[in-house]
Amino acid sequence: MKKGFIQNVHLAPATSLFVPQYKNDFFHLKTKAFLVHKLSESTNAAFTNLLHTLTLKLGFASDTFTVNHLVISYVKLKEINTARKLFDEMCEPNVVSWTSVISGYNDMGKPQNALSMFQKMHEDRPVPPNEYTFASVFKACSALAESRIGKNIHARLEISGLRRNIVVSSSLVDMYGKCNDVETARRVFDSMIGYGRNVVSWTSMITAYAQNARGHEAIELFRSFNAALTSDRANQFMLASVISACSSLGRLQWGKVAHGLVTRGGYESNTVVATSLLDMYAKCGSLSCAEKIFLRIRCHSVISYTSMIMAKAKHGLGEAAVKLFDEMVAGRINPNYVTLLGVLHACSHSGLVNEGLEYLSLMAEKYGVVPDSRHYTCVVDMLGRFGRVDEAYELAKTIEVGAEQGALLWGALLSAGRLHGRVEIVSEASKRLIQSNQQVTSAYIALSNAYAVSGGWEDSESLRLEMKRSGNVKERACSWIENKDSVYVFHAGDLSCDESGEIERFLKDLEKRMKERGHRGSSSMITTSSSVFVDVDEEAKDEMVSLHCERLALAYGLLHLPAGSTIRIMNNLRMCRDCHEAFKLISEIVEREIVVRDVNRFHCFKNGSCTCRDYW
């Protein structure tokens, strides 16, 4: 009869090979240990189904220990509905049962179900959670960015006696970080000193900083980790977060340190880490290094191609970006909506208007991507940069967008109006932004500048006073530059640093050499894209422009960085046209390559020209 039962079980061809093993081993040993062992080994649904049948036939359906292993096996196989059905049929589910299903919902991308299970765990037949339960529910809160629920569960944790568990505390740090509550995450992290921190807890805190635009703290904490007397080594997740922080800040030197650790740790073949490195080098202004990383990636994906296309686009290499896109499609890697955004961005920043319009028209038919407001906004930007402002304006009026995307749309049109001296377009775009309550400060400033260009200094000043009364404060312009292991930050007009005298003398000497070559400064360039909109004499305007933060950073770099090395400057705002023209000439005078990353793109100055070709 036993033989008949086994032979009547329907198995996939691969699992039928195991039947003789069951006849000899299982029925000989007659222990549930055999079942549990086989369940832990199972990687096949048919195999687990067979074991499930045997469990029922042999009377283990009411054995919590055995059924838990069945639940865990189904969870591993992504069969969460079957796992949940088994759980619901259990007579006495214990903490392992509950935690397994909660974890399963997390793995299937259903964090809301995981939290519902946790709530049910306390309501039906209260079962005290263990450290793995708490870690799983904090993971669910992280996925949903639910800080309110997370704090309530944190309160339960405090009275559970498990607060000092390193697994739970690490997941708690991660949860607060993903909920944008970095201060609370740091308090939890600091409290772990008393009972130990491991590479997971360090990674969680570094990632919290990196993901919340606090790259400086991420790098400093990474330095502390390296200095700590611990046997732990940075893993690929920590390194990816550090590399991301270096990308956002333009910290090339620390990015290279992280790259060295990636190599020593053997993570270069990890696609996520390699793509992070590619992105870091590109955003730090070292496109050649980014290209080397790209060429080393063995198995390319849409992510690696998209990152490289975006990098080339930001550096003004539109033709190269388009060529790479064609190579990707020829290699049968399907683009996604981000890839096509990158292609349109490349066309916009390189003056490839006809090509960009063609890609837009073919997106749905040829590439299977329906263009949305983000793609149309990119086309508005492209038309505006090329001087086809009226077409850009007409297109902008037809696009249906929400408030946030609308800010990007009208912000692009505002930039086009400023660039091409279209005061009426600047005025219209600014008013729409102010009405939408998005990018209000930049809109006020642009509208004020538009009044100033047309000679309406009183209207301009009145608008700036209104801006102050409404609490909108212009972000202070700053530039920073790396020298060895340090970063030097400069603000416009600020000469309070130790080298201020030397920098000021150097800039005046540069200004003299520029004028000898015909440079006439800001007084010859007063348009809506100029940078000085104050009713002062021309000499004072030139003085104000000469102390812009990017010029101060440039002077420092030329004075202190090794001769012949590339000067890399990061800027938190858009580079002004006056400085852009000056940098082109300076690159020729000093015979140095100068790379400036502003809020929109990279400008690579060399031999008197810029890679943007003035499409910016």
Swiss-Prot record:
GO terms for biological process: RNA modification. Belongs to the PPR family. PCMP-H subfamily. InterPro entries: DYW_dom, E_motif, Pentatricopeptide_rpt, PPR_At4g14850-like_plant, TPR-like_helical_dom_sf. Signal peptide: none annotated. This is Pentatricopeptide repeat-containing protein At4g15720. Gene3D superfamilies: Tetratricopeptide repeat domain. The keyword Repeat applies. One of its GO terms (molecular function) is RNA binding. Residues 409-484 are annotated as: Type E motif. The gene is PCMP-H1. The keyword Transmembrane does not apply. PPR repeats lie at residues 63-93, 94-128, 130-164, 165-199, 200-228, 235-269, 270-300, 301-335, 336-371, 372-402. Residues 485-515 are annotated as: Type E(+) motif. Residues 522-616 are annotated as: Type DYW motif. Keywords: Repeat.
